[in-house]
């Protein structure tokens, strides 16, 4: 039984990355920005796994573990900053917070 072709996996990773990039550029809510960054990081992790499985190397899975640990750290720090900004400014809009800075 054969697996998914590499082109299909990389196409899916590229589509996910583009969706995350569009969300990052279009949305102004900090929660949606963090979710878009998570989608982009997962897309890059998927590309590593697909490329690693193509050449039967464990390097892709090792990079996946590193990307997931980086994503977990980014999510925890991002959510902590999100809570602090919401408590201080009562909004999650990035433009409003930057205008309030003075």
Curated annotation (Swiss-Prot):
This protein's GO cellular component annotations are: NADH dehydrogenase complex; plasma membrane
A GO molecular-function descriptor: NADH:ubiquinone reductase (non-electrogenic) activity
Q: How does it sit in the membrane?
A: Multi-pass membrane protein
* InterPro entries the UniProt entry points to: NADH_UbQ_OxRdtase_chain4L/K, NUOK/Mnh_C1-like
Keyword rRNA processing part of the UniProt annotation:
no
**UniProt keyword list:** Cell inner membrane, Cell membrane, Membrane, NAD, Quinone, Translocase, Transmembrane, Transmembrane helix, Transport, Ubiquinone
Pfam family membership, one:
Oxidored_q2
Record field: transmembrane:
6-26, 30-50, 65-85
As for subcellular location, the record says: Cell inner membrane
What is the uppermost EC class here?
translocase
Q: Which GO biological process categories is it annotated with?
A: ATP synthesis coupled electron transport
Catalyses which reaction? a quinone + NADH + 5 H(+)(in) = a quinol + NAD(+) + 4 H(+)(out)
Q: What is its main location?
A: membrane
Enzyme Commission number, as recorded: 7.1.1.-
Q: Which family does it belong to?
A: Belongs to the complex I subunit 4L family.
Q: What HAMAP family would the database entry show? A: NDH1_NuoK
Assembly and binders: NDH-1 is composed of 13 different subunits. Subunits NuoA, H, J, K, L, M, N constitute the membrane sector of the complex.
UniProt function note:
NDH-1 shuttles electrons from NADH, via FMN and iron-sulfur (Fe-S) centers, to quinones in the respiratory chain. The immediate electron acceptor for the enzyme in this species is believed to be ubiquinone. Couples the redox reaction to proton translocation (for every two electrons transferred, four hydrogen ions are translocated across the cytoplasmic membrane), and thus conserves the redox energy in a proton gradient.
Q: What is this protein called?
A: NADH-quinone oxidoreductase subunit K
Originating organism: Shewanella oneidensis (strain ATCC 700550 / JCM 31522 / CIP 106686 / LMG 19005 / NCIMB 14063 / MR-1)
Gene encoding this polypeptide?
nuoK
């Amino acid at each position: 039984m054969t697996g998914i072709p590499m082109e299909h996996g990389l196409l899916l990773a590229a589509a996910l990355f583009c969706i995350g990039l569009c969300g990052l550029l279009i949305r102004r809510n900090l929660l949606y920005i963090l979710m878009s960054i998570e989608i982009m990081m997962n897309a890059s992790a998927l590309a590593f796994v697909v490329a690693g499985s193509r050449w039967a190397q464990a390097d892709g899975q090792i990079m996946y573990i590193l990307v997931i640990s980086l994503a977990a750290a980014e999510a925890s720090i991002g959510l902590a900053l999100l809570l602090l900004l919401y408590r201080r400014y009562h909004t999650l809009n990035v433009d409003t917070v930057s205008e309030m800075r003075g």
